[in-house]
């Protein structure tokens, strides 16, 4: 029986998911947890996935379809949270798949232990080949008892295999609303900041090592695109912004929770992503611009000041040396060029 105390609202941002969306929806309507509402936010789709969404909304009373002009997954998720009527909310990507007992497992955990968040493991799958592997190996992270949100976040980050993805859990809606936790419009990998802030506010969290979600990778996945030139520069700006936002969260919550070393060091890890992208960038001018932004944005300082271990400190110092070396080389090149052409 569905009531306000056991209801789950599943939020799906929909943008041109094609026929994969049908598989996603079939996995949701066959869930063993029946106290469920499914909220599809059509984010300006132009393909047949809109017709698929209409079919399910017309034929299943617990499926709702809302429309908005294309504004991105963050805006769609925020809107879904606003209209959700469940005690808990969950998020699904429109081209993924949910295993039949996912929400029964997580909601049972949440209700029995009065959790703010229940999270699970997931399988990652290449859509083209079918190759599948578990996201978090059990030798790195096992099922837990009830923890505080910060303690669970610390444990997950320490495993180095836990990922900031919102689709591996159910979240108490009141925690989101009370603390005004929003997905940031236009920010790629917005899950990183959102999950961090949610865990900072969660009093009771629990994790199961069961894989209950199937995340599909394909050639056009955002995380797998090989970017070069301006596309790479613009993409790395998102990670630079994430380092700033994470540092701001640590600062804002320092008087409310223990800011563990892992919360600092995740900033360094995100900064190192940008450094690796600089190294792989083939276009010299773009690389120079990326290096300049690392310094002017303050990311260079965040890379160094948030180190909390010898191993990561060594990596950060190595990259610090490289960045200064590259920047000095660029400046020397500019000076020589200007001198050769008698420029002032």
From Swiss-Prot:
Broad EC category: transferase
EC number in record: 2.4.-.-
Keyword terms, alphabetized: Glycosyltransferase, Transferase
Pfam families: Glycos_transf_2
GO molecular function, one term: glucuronosyltransferase activity
Family recorded in the similarity comment: Belongs to the glycosyltransferase 2 family.
Name listed for the protein in its UniProt record: Uncharacterized glycosyltransferase YibD
Species per Swiss-Prot/TrEMBL record: Escherichia coli (strain K12)
Gene: yibD
